[in-house]
Every structure is written in C-alpha cells, then in structure tokens.
From Swiss-Prot:
GO terms for cellular component: cytosol; lysosome; mitochondrion. It catalyses: a hydroperoxide + 2 glutathione = an alcohol + glutathione disulfide + H2O; a 1,2-diacyl-sn-glycero-3-phosphocholine + H2O = a 1-acyl-sn-glycero-3-phosphocholine + a fatty acid + H(+); a 1-acyl-sn-glycero-3-phosphocholine + an acyl-CoA = a 1,2-diacyl-sn-glycero-3-phosphocholine + CoA; 1-hexadecanoyl-sn-glycero-3-phosphocholine + hexadecanoyl-CoA = 1,2-dihexadecanoyl-sn-glycero-3-phosphocholine + CoA. GO terms for molecular function: 1-acylglycerophosphocholine O-acyltransferase activity; peroxidase activity; peroxiredoxin activity; phospholipase A2 activity. Homodimer. Interacts with GSTP1; mediates PRDX6 glutathionylation and regeneration. Interacts with APEX1. Interacts with STH. May interact with FAM168B. May interact with HTR2A. Changing D140A: Loss of phospholipase activity, but no effect on lysophosphatidylcholine acyltransferase activity. The gene is Prdx6. One of its GO terms (biological process) is response to reactive oxygen species. It comes from the Eukaryota. This is Peroxiredoxin-6. Keywords: Acetylation, Antioxidant, Cytoplasm, Hydrolase, Lipid degradation, Lipid metabolism, Lysosome, Multifunctional enzyme, Oxidoreductase, Peroxidase, Phosphoprotein, Redox-active center, Transferase. Transmembrane segments: none annotated. Highly expressed in heart, kidney and liver. Moderate expression in brain and stomach. Very low levels in intestine. The modification Phosphotyrosine is found at Y89.
C-alpha cells in the first residue's frame, strides 16, 4: 500500500471538503488532540455501527480535548444523507448533523497519501475502498498511535478512548500503562527512572513485585 504515516510523523496539512465545509487539517486541529479515522463506505452496516458509537462517545472525547474527523471515498452529499441513518441507529432524531465532520475523498487522494486503502476490499468499479484506519495526533500534530483494521472487523471505540487516556498520561508523566489498564488504575514506572528518582516523582509510593530473576523492573504506582 503506497503512502502512509509512521509514529512521530507530522500530519500532512491537507485541505479537504467535509460535511462542515472545506477545512485545512492543521487549522481544524488547532491546539487539540485529533483522531482521523477512515471507513470503507457510507450506507453499510459495520460502518454505521462504528460512527454511531463514535457519535455516542463524542462528549467523552471532547472532555479530553480530542477532535474527531472521519473519512471515506463517498461524497459530502452521501455523508449528509447517511448521517440521518446513523442518528436513527442511535435512537436520535434523524438529522444530517453529527458531532464530527466526515471528509469527502472521492478521488482517493488522501487515502493514498495516508496509506488508508484496503488491498482486498473493492467497490463496484473494482477500485479499492478505505480500510478501517485510526490515526491519533497530539497537539504537536505528530502521530502518536495508528490502528489498521480490515473492512470486515469493526473497531472498538471504547478502546480508542482508553488509549487516548494512556497517551495523554504517559506523554506528561514517566509512566507506562500495563495490559488492560483503565483510567484511574495503577501504572508502571518506566525502567529508565532510578529508584531514587521514582521516590521523588511518585509521593504516593512505588510497589516493586519480587521476581525469580531478582530484577526490579515491575514497579507500580497509583496513577499520578
């Protein structure tokens, strides 16, 4: 798949037509975190459930200073008409308004630039459609996380919210989040921090799990 972004890459400052008008990506993001996520096609079952869940969680993302923006190879007109179905699926009034814009990428220019095309799934003209990609950008416009799902597997937007919590915490504190971590649970002290530094950084205390190797790398502390 041509194109694509690596962790640490700056987001391209592209211009695009969306359901809220024409945007320039960096201006849209401003000083916020941003999640750009693509879906294969409008008016399809899995995509409807995904964007419905994203809409439901939009207030939680907003609390975390995160802006959402979706993308597919469909037109703005299709996006707006489909938005009614998404709102109806959520049990809401079937309006054209969602809590985030959707990008019109009919020409696949952005999908190619960002490496979003699915090599397997095709449209009626045998052209590749967009895969289920998630890019999370920090306020510095740099890519902090990327996820790539095939068209047949819907994403878990609660998990995406969880990784935002992890990224925002670990970006400011010398900690890492362990498996299945959720906001408010204990975190792990990064190995580069000495015992003395850890004591100074974490006044709530540091617990070290004893291991057969004798190495003291499993160090936990309450979430700072």
């Amino acid at each position: 798949m041509p194109g694509g972004l690596l962790l640490g890459d700056e987001a391209p400052n592209f211009e695009a037509n969306t359901t809220i008008g024409r945007i320039r990506f960096h201006d849209f993001l401003g000083d916020s975190w941003g999640i750009l996520f693509s879906h294969p096609r409008d008016f399809t079952p899995v995509c409807t459930t995904e964007l419905g869940r994203a809409a439901k969680l939009a207030p939680e993302f907003a609390k975390r200073n995160v802006k959402l923006i979706a993308l597919s190879i469909d037109s703005v007109e299709d996006h707006l008409a489909w938005s009614k179905d998404i709102n109806a699926y959520n049990g809401e009034t079937p309006t054209e308004k969602l809590p985030f814009p959707i990008i019109d990428d009919k020409g696949r220019d952005l999908a190619i630039l960002l490496g979003m095309l699915d090599p397997v799934e095709k449209d009626d003209n045998n052209m590749p459609v967009t895969a289920r990609v998630v890019f999370i950008f920090g306020p510095d416009k740099k890519l902090k996380l990327s996820i790539l799902y095939p068209a047949t597997t819907g994403r878990n937007f609660d998990e995406i919210l969880r990784v935002v919590d992890s990224l925002q915490l670990t970006g400011t504190k010398p900690v890492a989040t362990p498996v299945d971590w959720k906001k408010g649970e204990s975190v792990m002290v990064v190995p580069t921090l000495s015992e003395e530094e850890a004591k100074q950084c974490f006044p709530k205390g540091v617990f070290t799990k004893e291991l057969p190797s004798g190495k003291k790398y499993l160090r936990y502390t309450p979430q700072p």
